[in-house]
Each structure stands twice: as structure tokens, then as C-alpha cells.
Amino acid sequence: MNYQMITTDDALASLCEAVRAFPAIALDTEFVRTRTYYPQLGLIQLFDGEHLALIDPLGITDWSPLKAILRDPSITKFLHAGSEDLEVFLNVFGELPQPLIDTQILAAFCGRPMSWGFASMVEEYSGVTLDKSESRTDWLARPLTERQCEYAAADVWYLLPITAKLMVETEASGWLPAALDECRLMQMRRQEVVAPEDAWRDITNAWQLRTRQLACLQLLADWRLRKARERDLAVNFVVREEHLWSVARYMPGSLGELDSLGLSGSEIRFHGKTLLALVEKAQTLPEDALPQPMLNLMDMPGYRKAFKAIKSLITDVSETHKISAELLASRRQINQLLNWHWKLKPQNNLPELISGWRGELMAEALHNLLQEYPQ
């Protein structure tokens, strides 16, 4: 593999000009995310069939040539298991590569495992066993070693030739339109951003709290998410989730009480007064400003029967259409559908099981089934 290390704006512009002559590119990123809220970009890998490039973001100030490539509709971008890479692109460039196809999704429609790893795919299609020893390396450290660079370059060097085979295979299976729809769904999921005022809904065991405690949790979770984004710090490095829940549950009135709830010294030192102020604010809210009690999906009287009935329907659809039941519906998607049906959580879009390619296969049957399970 003869790769080119791109470390300057001029080199990036020259590379992108050359890439424009090709109809498809393989992309990958290397990043670090240990304590930060946002992934920290360490490297971008690109291969168009002729130019194999490692783009070092630490030396680039003008990203406009690459952004133009990413949004060029005449160049298809291929990634493998690219959901986290998409988050990197959104964070760095404010947009996603378009059009985009994920080879892990293509492979799933061709009967491969749902989470088929890149190394397994390369071994099957190319007969090459990849060295994955650098997968946990520090991609922000400089200089990068030759071994690191070769590891990174291999991710796109082997990916691009495989894409053509997978596209043919998926099209022959008759599932290519559905696979492309699933790629669009992956992008849509990645672009969903939690509003701080809704962050409390994602706190484990929030449903166990009463209304004023929920109001307190709403204030605490809103503050924590804003602080995490502002400081680029993972939310649990601001205040741990279980500690946030405990503060909402017991609504302490002193730093000593925070300590007795098990909060760490640093949590109390840096945020103790803020937490107490938010508790006090929740204490003074009028009754009509309190949120409605949360209902736990799994405690709904018909949940187990409804879940089992949906699973049975999915098995039937899977066998009829000769497609993996695991690909057709996950536990998360079934729960999303039931949350929507029983109006337990606000949702901006139709549940995934009754929209897109899945909806074409089973929306009508699911709607009929759900009528048997009113709230």
C-alpha cells in the first residue's frame, strides 16, 4: 500500500481535485473519545481506487475542498459500520457525506451477521487477515507510527474493491432499494440531537420518580447536558447519571446531604451549589408546571403479550420474505413502536417498523395487531 499523508491545505486541495474524476470513494475515520462529549478526530482515510490518502486534521485549516467532495452527488461514499464516523463528520464539518452507502448494511441484506466486522468481511472477500492490533491506539498522538498508518490505510484500501461485489450481490438479492433506505435511516438517526429540556427522559429509572422529583430531574438533566456540550465533556464526567437521579429523588438541601448521597468530591466541589440551586428551583415550581408522571413501558398491562405478538408477526414476515428477523426488527424498534402506540414518549417521526422499507413489508399487519392492545 502506497499511501500519501496529507498534512497541508494545498495537499488536501490537490487530492480533492484528483478525486473528482472517480465515481466512488471509500472513507473511514480514526478518532478518540475517552472523556469528551464529542469525538476527537485523529485521521481521515480516503481511497478512490488510485489515490490512497491519510488526511491529518491537525495540520488542516481549510476544509472546503473536502467538504465539496463530501457533498458532491456524483461521488458515492462508502463506509463500513459508519454510524460513529458520521458523528465525526457532523461534528467537524456540520454535514454528512452524500450520497452514502454502508457496506455493513449491504452485507446484512445479503445474509451476513448484523454487526459483521470489517476484518471478517475482508477475510471472506479478499482472503486477507488484517492486523487489528492498532484499533485502540491514540490517534491524537504525533508522530503516527508506520504501523498505525498502514493499519488506517488498510481500512479503505480493502473496502473499495469489496463495495462493487457487495452492490452486485445486494442487487441480485432484490434488497438493494431496502438497503439504501436503511442507509438513509442510519443517517437520519445520527442527525437526531437531544434537546436539553428532553434529556431527563433518557435517564434510567426516571419513571420511578414522582412529579416534583421529575421536575427536579428535568432541570438537572437539562443543566448537565448543556454543561457537557459547553465543556466538551462526557455527561458522566460532569455528574454521574445515578447521582443525578439520587439528587432528584431525595432533593437534598445541603452539601453534606449531597455527600451522603454518594456524590464524588469533585462533583460536589465543582457543581454542588448549582445542584442545590436547581433542587430549590424545583421545590418552588407551581403544581401546574410539573411534568406528568412517566409510565414505564415494561409495566404496561399488555406489554408482554404485545411484544410476543409482534415478535411472532416479525418471524412470519421474515420467513415469507427470506430476510433475517434480526435485521427486520430489534428489541429497541419494537419498544419504540409500543411507546408510540401507547403514547408514552413523544416522537417526531413514525416508528421505524411502520415506515420505510419495513413499513412496506408489515405496516398494515402491525397496525391491525396493535388494535388488539389499546392503552
Curated annotation (Swiss-Prot):
Q: Which SUPFAM superfamilies match?
A: HRDC-like, Ribonuclease H-like
Residues crossing the lipid bilayer are none
The coding gene here is rnd
Q: Which cofactor does it need?
A: a divalent metal cation
Q: Which UniProt keywords apply?
A: Cytoplasm, Exonuclease, Hydrolase, Nuclease, tRNA processing
Task: Give every HRDC domain span.
Answer: 210-289
Domain of life of the organism encoding this protein: Bacteria
Does this entry carry the keyword Hydrolase?
Answer: yes
Specify the 3'-5' exonuclease domain's residue ranges: 3-169
Role, per record: Exonuclease involved in the 3' processing of various precursor tRNAs. Initiates hydrolysis at the 3'-terminus of an RNA molecule and releases 5'-mononucleotides.
The organism that produces this protein has a lineage beginning with: Bacteria, Pseudomonadati, Pseudomonadota, Gammaproteobacteria, Enterobacterales
User: What does the record give as the reaction this protein catalyses?
Assistant: Exonucleolytic cleavage that removes extra residues from the 3'-terminus of tRNA to produce 5'-mononucleotides
Q: Give its E.C. classification number.
A: 3.1.13.5
Could you state one GO cellular component term attached to this entry?
cytoplasm
Q: What sort of enzyme, by top EC class, is this?
A: hydrolase
Matching entries from PROSITE patterns are given as: HRDC
Protein's name in the database: Ribonuclease D
